[in-house]
Amino acid sequence: MTAEHDSVTPAPADEGDIKGTVFNIQRYSIQDGPGIRTTVFLKGCPLRCAWCSNPESQNAKPEVAHRDSLCIRCGRCTDVCPQKAISTDENGIFIDRQLCKSCARCVDACPQGALKMYGVTMTAAEVFQQVRKDAEFYRGSGGGVTVSGGEPLFQPDFVAALLKLCRDNGIETCIETCGLAKTDALNKVLPYLSQVLFDIKLADSNDHLKWTQAPNEAIVRNLRIVAASGIPLIIRIPLIPGINDTEDELRKIAEIVSENVEKPVKVNLLPYHKFGMGKYQMLDREYQLGELDTQTKDQLQEAKQLIESYGFECDIEG
């Protein structure tokens, strides 16, 4: 019997109808937890990491992006925009984001796909109908559903409703979190989780504020809460050249984890990359770290060995 014909335990109407803002549902993911997974990416994040590879996730509301290389200057977008927020010239598309209401009329009118909407409103039940399509793959591979972002805890009611639907129907669940959230939001989601992927970016709170625009005291507090819950936990460290990949900084991060999480715990290192740079241009934003180079294999191995010296199992992702 296929997953499409499996019986489904429905959510209570009020839970299934809870709405969230989603910008991508990625099937067959193998990077966001064990096994084959579907990753649900949500809009909205309390951090503004200088290296963020998903700038389209930061704003909580839907937003229009543009790809100038596809624009043929037909003017259809300018004609249909009720806010007169779009103009075009020989250099491409200009969107006045103070005027734009993200109504998506320009996106629908564009014959070339030069305009794209990041973010759509969906109910928890609607998202579940999408992710349950691959239930047999989850069961066969030890996978499941991961909710990422942005920050999942930015939409706690929606995430709790979606995860409960998954768990009630035998699908393993996971979130990827930056850790910055109200305790109430975290506690609302924890009962429906099979695993947590928890980012630790910088040890010093002032440095954290400088590079992410938020201090890290609440993040460390929430790390303790997740660790105490007994839910399987993986620590993820995005390695940013010259910012947090030095020996001194990695030792400080390892010490924070040691002080707040009982071993054994796994640490995943995420090498720096520039895959998101093009999206900054599409959203009329500036990427601050374009001059940085990715780490060498030797540098990554040194970082891995340092983390392992603290008694952690450590992998390099990618």
Regions found by a protein language model. Name each.
Residues 1-34, 227, 239-318:
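Auxiliary Fe-S-binding modules of radical SAM enzymes
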Residues 66-68, 209-215, 284-292:
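Short glycine-enriched, charge-decorated loop/helix-capping segments at active-site entrances
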